[in-house]
Amino acid sequence: SMRNFDYITNPAKLLTPEIVQMVGSIHEHKGKQELFLEANIDELKTLLEITLIQSTGASNRIEGIFTSDKRLEELVSQKAEPRNRSEQEIAGYREVLATIHESYEYITPKPNIILQLHRDLYSYSQGNIGGTYKNSDNVITETDAEGHQKARFIPVPAFQTAEAIDELCARFLEAWEANLIDKLILIP
């Protein structure tokens, strides 16, 4: 294997006493959450809308994609059509986030699903760039204060990407179905 996709021993290393306590607390509160959800559905819908807008804005800013708060809200609420490349990427992100939110129980991490979500991510963009693996190598770089560039992250080479995604998904699903590690720890 070209990368280490070990979802059994690597996640087990995360099980510090503090993490185990947090996971237990999350599971304990999960039952109480159902009652709270039923009693406060309107407030939660409002919170969800705010969260979707903030999450979309934050995730896109990480990628260097910016727009005004007003435009972001309009795009996420589907009250506006994207005007430029940044807004097209925001609209695509909104679509994928909505798919995950509405159908997460039915989404299995498999290569074809990942490619479908990638296609949807770029569905508003020009040039059919979504839904396929990269066809050229890339390196994520950073520039220091003196202007020197260095590799921050070296992704899998293009010719190995499909194989790496197959392996990643297979190892993750294997660990998920083995049920040896709490799923909250297993999720990357």
Task: State where each predicted segment sits.
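FIC/Doc superfamily catalytic core
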Residues: 1-188
